[in-house]
């Protein structure tokens, strides 16, 4: 396990680089036979790792020494030298390169902000994958707020400091990063370029945008969730007031110019009685909207997944996932929760009587199976990542896989479960501080643990969609706007 702490690091290494084509065996690749950096860089230097971070002080230079191998020239911050003392401010980076002939290997050390969350890393993640995370949520503890993109070594290669708690950060074309704020005070998703500048906002025509989900369709529209208050509802059968406001769950699709093209609401489709298990929470803890209206959150929509003409919707407080025919609005099937005529029969699931408990992050895979993060909330069991095969002809949901982590005992909220291209899983364990990757059989492969914080989701992104060069350039641009350090 590795923890980022200021200290002295002295590492003896041998770095090899290769160019295109084949080279004669007698030609030695550029190498560094020794490196020292003060304060400590994370992770330890390795020729295969090109991005590092350091906790630095602008008044105290980062001191670097690099010893080249035979026939190689070291370059520190672009200058041919073996030692340097470089002053860095937050977000700034220094490069260390080694050159032999036309072959160069470059490495990048970037200064973390002093308030960037602490984290530890175990193992190595799936190659070719980034992880977008928002490690800022905590239970009663004030913290700085960041959207961050980590590489397979658990190194934050890009980050953006936000004014409020970011939630549901996701990659959009550009590349850009979109996120909402928690609680949903902004009533919009902000879209930021990698240099931090605001590229736009996604808003709901109704104003009460939810902060749980944003999807982009193939034609460029945006699909998201909306808080939909329904007033003057008699809630006395459920232990509530005779004249209450129910917070219905609503899905909206808008164009990039915010024109509404489709919507669907739980109102008229999902009965309040489907939330019976959650009544103590619903009635005991009303939700106050940004305009001050007190409401009762019977449904708590938290995830949407698009599957051609079908939309999957997760409602936390019915313990159910609903398949909605986009053309008719009809519920085609339901997985979990209070039985209804649309309910699927669950097959092969040891928790089949209650397959879902406050679940999050339903996703449809290319093969038609679905994955979901089952929080197991208030069911006396640990959370899990689950995959089901849905058969509409037999009206069944057959469990194919489940992933658990013995280090994670409970989950009260949040979480995500994504299958990677190689069949591994990446899981954010809800209200727990762990983001992990697991083999298909559940074997732990990689883990990031945030110090007392958790990320609403962990979103894997293929490197084919986002390059390290783009992330570094974005960070360099943000650093230049703040306070360039004297070199």
Model-derived segments and spans:
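Intrinsically disordered/low-complexity terminal segments and short unstructured peptides
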Residues: 19, 35-39, 81-82, 327, ...
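Acidic/proline-rich low-complexity IDRs
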Residues: 3, 7-8, 31, 87, ...
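Beta-rich interaction/scaffold domains
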Residues: 24-119
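Secretory targeting and sorting signals
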Residues: 2-25
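Intrinsically disordered, low-complexity, compositionally biased regions/tails
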Residues: 20-25, 38, 43, 47-50, ...
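Histidine-/acidic-rich catalytic cores in large beta-rich domains
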Residues: 110-487
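Compositionally biased, intrinsically disordered low-complexity segments
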Residues: 14-16, 38-40, 485
